[in-house]
From Swiss-Prot:
Taxonomic placement: Bacteria, Bacillati, Actinomycetota, Actinomycetes, Mycobacteriales
EC number(s) recorded for this UniProt protein: 1.1.5.4
Any one GO molecular-function label of the UniProt entry: 2-hydroxyglutarate dehydrogenase activity
Record's keyword terms, sorted: FAD, Flavoprotein, Oxidoreductase, Tricarboxylic acid cycle
UniProt cofactor(s): FAD
GO biological process, one term: tricarboxylic acid cycle
Pathway assigned in UniProt: Carbohydrate metabolism; tricarboxylic acid cycle; oxaloacetate from (S)-malate (quinone route): step 1/1
Gene that encodes it: mqo
Family annotation (InterPro entries): FAD/NAD-bd_sf (IPR036188), MQO (IPR006231)
Top-level class of the enzyme under EC nomenclature: oxidoreductase
NCBIfam families, per database record: mal_quin_oxido, PRK05257.1-4, PRK05257.2-1, PRK05257.3-2, PRK13339.1
Gene3D superfamilies, alphabetized: FAD/NAD(P)-binding domain
Membrane-crossing residue ranges in chain numbering: none
Protein name: Probable malate:quinone oxidoreductase
Organism (species): Mycobacterium sp. (strain KMS)
Amino acid sequence: MSDAQVAKTDVVLVGAGIMSATLSALIKLLEPNWSITLIERLDGAAAESSDPWNNAGTGHSALCELNYTPEGPGGSIDITKAVHVNEQFQVSRQFWTYAVENGVLPDVRNFINPIPHVSFVSGARNVEYLRARYDALVPNPLFATMEYIDDRDEFARRLPFMADKRDFREPVALNWSQDGTDIDFGSLSRQLIGYTAQRGMTTLFGHEVRDLDKQSDGSWSVKVVNRRTGAKRKLNAKFVFVGAGGGALPLLQKAGIEEAKGFGGFPVGGQWLRTGNPELTARHQAKVYGMPPLGAPPMSVPHLDTRVINGKSWLLFGPFAGWSPKFLKQGKVTDLPFSVKPNNLASMLGVGLTEMGLLKYLIGQLLLSEADRVETLRNFAPSARDSDWELDIAGQRVQVIRRKGKGGVLEFGTTVLAAKDGSIAGLLGASPGASTAVPAMLDVMERCFGDRYTAWLPKLKEIVPSLGTKLSDEPKLFQEIWAHGTKVLKLDHPAAGLPVAGTDTEHREPATTVTA
């Protein structure tokens, strides 16, 4: 196609990660005749933050992440954030259930597997906190099956690798949620994109969006270059979604929308220790989250995770922070400096002057040797040997910097930016990220297609039966939806070797072990 020719399309999706993949499938289910064009700078889908090696794959549902349940005055536990994140995850889970039932996702076991989610603490004060957390969460229907465990024998039965060589004179405790999942968002993204592509979506891999220009009729001119040949082309789109991970902010800045002004981004790299040693993976089958180091940011919460990637079990421990000015793992060192604009300079400088804790944390992380990292792992698994573990570089996270007063504030979460006229939207931020892709994209659709969204609601409620309802307020509906999803997603049988769990093992005898 020559530069003079302009291809028209109803929707342009920038980036082939979980956000664009989810939006493409939702649009195709609701408006099968709309034309969609997906543009991805790399040669394959989900190769950046959605790739399983580049994210934690936790299926963030706030079952185990302690930063979602902060302790308040007098030892009270605030569960507001945990309930909100879990409600969002339930929406995603319902969409995946519908997608499996209706042929959108053909290979369920390739993207989701059952794995317990566990909170772990040591030390008397932290044990008190975890008991209080359990007491606060378990009355809520979304967390009703959580267990509290402080018995050393039960700890060792559930988590034998973590029990090896542990000095149990220091008290330990667990919040154990049997109903957790491990999610390969790379596989999930590729299946969703495959479904939409088979139904007419144009995919441009190895192509990069260089500019976005608003047209007089309200549409967008999208300038694209083929990264292999240098050939240029233009697309005209009625709606543009920028789901380009760390690359979203620069593109929204180029679009010049008012809503992006004042926003900045701060890139933080991630690193993991990983092992595929079958002896170790057989003896640790859970995602176990600990307490963040004192003064460290929420993204630093350490966890020892079972991962299932391409059918093989792995253990990952981290994250350890790295630093690069790149906004993408395969980005450019100029990403950060080029993102500083007159309209966000105050925000960026404000964060630089106030986030000393983050700066101190990053410097400390950068000074760690590989031996230091394994020593950190030994807080979880005292018997860990250096020779079993290798360092793996994960993806880049770009934390949102938002204008506040005359300065700025660093936010740990995801933010949807949408133009007032609904012609363009984008997603900024990181955790909880991928697990909340469905509610995030429903938010985009409601804000950008307000007139059509009302007409879509009957179909959307078929896809997400609880849409508009808080399941934590409707225990009967939650049980029905949960049981159906568990069956369809094949999550009703624990993986081989996982223990049977009851409702509270605090004073129970050890149960038997499932081997099937």
